[in-house]
């Protein structure tokens, strides 16, 4: 895949001036370097990583040319906006710049935007290939106010002959039912570790980045299925240290180290509450939030080698504690109580 502008046809500067991968320490470069997230953003639908079934439906839309209004829902960093831009590029070709309006609904979320910007664009005359429509892209559409969404549904009907709407959102249930019923809803899931690894290796090869296997594992661990996060972490670590290993990655990402968390779980499996608590107290005094600690405990526990029945019991207790923390009971005592319950699960029941 070539290094190209990902600005998606909105005429961003620096479209083709992405510099080749730096062979020296990156901080010394005297020119502007595009973020790798933008530099390696796919420009065609077949370059998108993951969610093959959903992307294949978009390819059918691009081939047939008859696109419905669409909603793409899914977690951050899975390629929702990129997919819409690739679809628009495939449909409109050279007319992309004039025939696409891209709005981020997090900023442009009020009813005035629907009444002014969107309506004005929908009314504009644009010369397009036969059977093609103008496209209005609403990113993070679940941030739009209810009033704006109500106004949007009427606009979608009035201009249905000339304009198609493409909405990207994290939670489709925050889009009102009348809009959902006017759209084809496509769902994206988090990317697998192997999918992220394949793209990381591709970028590493192009940028001539030195790395270790444990460094890539650390990037994948911190990304949690988010390709944007993975590429940002890769570039940040390379910019800061010039070498990708797990120590450098966790210095940049700064979250509870999974090796420490793994050791803590091992002490719980051995019913050694004192040693487990020492590690917990250490993480706490390093300033990590309870949400960060409990999140990493869960992620490490999922892949930890232990009896299946015990893993299920551990995950149940971790989930229960996570719920309490989310409700605001996030003290060190709450976390210590979790360790005590985990240790208790591993101890043989005492005959009465």
Swiss-Prot record:
Residues modified as Phosphoserine: 28
Subcellular location: Nucleus
Entry binding sites for ATP: 74-81
Gly residues: compositionally biased ranges: 1-12
Modified residues (N-acetylmethionine): 1
N6-acetyllysine PTM sites in chain numbering: 161, 302
Domain of life: Eukaryota
Keywords: Acetylation, ATP-binding, DNA replication, Nucleotide-binding, Nucleus, Phosphoprotein
Amino acid composition bias (Low complexity), ranges on this chain: 18-30
SMART domains: AAA (SM00382)
Family indicated by similarity: Belongs to the activator 1 small subunits family.
Protein name according to UniProt: Replication factor C subunit 2
Originating organism: Bos taurus (Bovine)
